[in-house]
Regions:
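A short alpha-helical cap/connector motif
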Residues: 1-112, 118-196
């Protein structure tokens, strides 16, 4: 799936429309996610932070190509219409949403957890202990350090930085940067970690 395969309207830096659904992403996500999914063969992808649904719709479309289960959580429903994807209007921090995510990680085969909610540090550190060997976890609005964000990203790649490597319990949870994918995804303000 390439940029030519879908309706794409750039509105401003950090926001575009995907089939009429607003997405808050760097538009170069389309350069990385298809190859990433092709190379990893995930069984389950879970997103925390649906927002207005554009990125969720894109991941859902990729799920149809690559054959993984996908669902997404947001405590606030900002969707303008009924989505084609499995949207769960629940907290990801506790209660039923938390239990579903833990169950999804535990019994979902090879899992990717996409962390893009209201407190990415909390969400990463909450679920990282449940990851299995060869699972992946990614955080959006990421930079390795604040200095790196100011020097290499702000005003160029992505203006927002809501988590850095030092915030994330990677060593405590046996997580490593995901080979070449970490180097690619930093170009769209996503971290990419895998469980040893």
């Amino acid at each position: 799936m390439s940029k030519s395969d879908f309706e794409y309207t750039c509105q401003r830096h950090g926001r575009f429309m995907y089939y009429g659904w607003p997405a808050q992403q760097n538009n170069h996500i389309f350069d990385y996610f298809p190859d990433f999914f092709q190379s990893q063969s995930f069984d389950t992808v879970i997103e925390i932070g649906t927002s207005e649904g554009g990125f969720s719709h894109y991941i859902y479309d990729l799920s149809q190509v690559h054959g993984f289960r996908f669902w997404t959580y947001d405590i606030e429903n900002k969707l303008r219409k009924t989505p084609p994807f499995d949207f769960r209007n629940k907290s990801a921090w506790d209660g039923e949403g938390y239990e579903e995510i833990v169950e999804g990680i535990t019994n979902g085969g090879k899992v990717l957890l996409l962390v893009d909610g209201g407190d990415k540090i909390k969400e990463f550190n909450l679920y990282a202990p449940f990851l299995k060997s060869d699972d992946f976890i990614m955080t959006h609005d990421y930079a390795p350090t604040l200095e790196y964000h100011e020097t290499h990203m702000k005003g160029k790649i992505w203006d927002w930085c809501e988590n850095i490597a030092a915030d994330l319990n990677v060593f405590e949870n046996d997580l490593l940067p995901a080979d070449l994918w970490s180097d690619k995804f930093i170009n769209v303000a996503w971290s990419c970690w895998t469980k040893e």
